[in-house]
Curated annotation (Swiss-Prot):
Its EC number is 4.1.1.-. One of its GO terms (biological process) is capsule polysaccharide biosynthetic process. Pathway: Capsule biogenesis; capsule polysaccharide biosynthesis. This is L-serine phosphate decarboxylase Cj1436c. Its cofactor is pyridoxal 5'-phosphate.
Length: 390
């Protein structure tokens, strides 16, 4: 049944729209929503993208080591290490020269730094994708869009793309892998082939914010492309820790890039850009016992997520696009407005989703649904089925 809003829901929806407009192309946080629209009772956050099981794992360590271990005061009171010191901790763990690792206050800080400092006159950005790569472009940078095909489920047509890049001759290109908002994934061998064909491009930016949710075999083994940097020095690999590890609140990410680029960044204000809590997390991240536990919950989360997507695909009003991330791009097929659907789910069921009507490169009524815990995913599925019965 077509989604319809009553007068009360329309009034709340307008408040939601106003908050969204104030947030630009990003969704307002659940804290902002709750504060500004107290009528809402948000129960499940299916908008923001993180692994809830990894959050629980981190909280357990934080409680045992910092709170119960009486070390939290030190983390809060004393200055954290400088960028290069924390970078060495990560570099030693991933097997990269420390001179090629840069720590960011979230991946978004790294994206902005890269766009402002290294991207020149022209960059190619695939669409639909994460908006910051065109929003952060300098005024003198020509952003050229490469449209991913809806008929191909927004997967990259590699040969067509390579020809497009050759004809445009940019100084920079961006590949988000898996892509946001559709979760499209370029496997290791195909990515390596792309890099080998684009050696003439000055900067190849590879955003791997969701790579821990992708897999290439039935064992869900982790994928590691860091070593490609050793072969292709024009790459800039950006990693967000927020999604994989469910720690968006502490703002942490890192990048792999050439030494001269990092040297330039450190001369321009990134010397002390990590908090004590983010440093604690990164030092925890490189410990074998923690990482082994994380890898176990990562694999379990992937299985639950893919099961969730299969169940979503069984809803006749939906087209669910194949995803190798922890979110699914969903097209509404019954004529319902994506704005009305997202509003109804939030107001009536307390489930916060993301409408994609502000995404450049999408034509139609699209929403993005993040995977949560098994219990939360079941509640989302039940609520969706209920809303279409009204």
């Amino acid at each position: 049944m077509l989604i319809k809003l009553n007068d009360y829901e329309k009034n709340i929806t307008q408040k939601i729209k106003d908050l969204k407009n104030a947030s630009g192309s990003h969704s307002p946080s659940i804290f902002t929503m709750a504060e500004q629209i107290p009528e809402l009772n948000i129960k499940i956050d299916s908008c923001f993208l993180s692994n809830p099981y990894a959050t629980a794992l981190f909280l357990r360590y934080l409680k045992e080591e910092l709170i119960d271990g009486q070390k939290l005061r030190s983390v809060l009171e004393f200055y954290p290490s400088q960028n290069s010191i924390i970078a060495k901790t990560v570099a030693d763990f991933i097997g990269i020269d420390p001179k090629n690792v840069f720590i960011g206050n979230g991946a978004i800080e790294i994206i902005q730094a890269v766009m402002h400092n290294f991207v020149g006159k022209k960059i190619i950005v695939n669409i639909p994708t994460f908006s910051s790569y065109y929003e952060f472009a300098k005024s003198e940078t020509n952003v050229v869009y490469y449209q991913l095909s809806k008929e191909d489920n927004y997967n990259l047509n590699i040969e067509h793309y390579l020809n497009f890049v050759k004809n445009e001759n940019p100084d920079s290109v961006v590949l988000i892998n898996p892509n946001n908002p559709d979760g499209g994934y370029i496997n290791y061998e195909k990515l390596r082939y792309i890099l080998s064909e684009l050696k003439y491009v000055k900067n190849i930016i590879i955003d791997e914010s969701f790579i821990h949710f992708a897999y290439e075999n039935k064992d869900y083994n982790g994928i590691n492309i860091e070593y490609l940097f050793k072969e292709f020095h024009n790459t800039i690999i950006i990693k967000s820790m927020s999604k994989d590890f469910g720690v968006a609140g502490i703002r942490i990410g890192y990048a792999i890039m050439s030494e001269d680029k990092i040297r330039g960044l450190l001369k321009n204000g990134y010397l002390w850009n990590s908090s004590g809590l983010s440093e604690y997390f990164l030092r925890l991240y490189v410990r074998k016992n923690f990482f082994d536990e994380y890898d176990k919950v990562r694999r379990e989360y992937i299985q639950e997520t893919q099961t969730f997507f299969r169940k979503l695909s069984g809803i006749k009003q939906f087209k669910v696009y194949p995803s190798m991330a922890n979110f699914a791009l969903v097209e509404l097929l019954d004529g319902s407005s994506s704005t009305d659907f997202v509003a109804k789910m939030l107001i009536k069921y307390g489930i916060y989703m993301r409408t994609c009507n502000d995404k450049i490169g999408l034509e139609g009524e699209f929403i993005r649904i993040a995977s949560r815990t098994l219990e939360e995913n079941d509640m989302v599925l039940k609520s969706i089925c209920d809303v279409f019965k009204e």
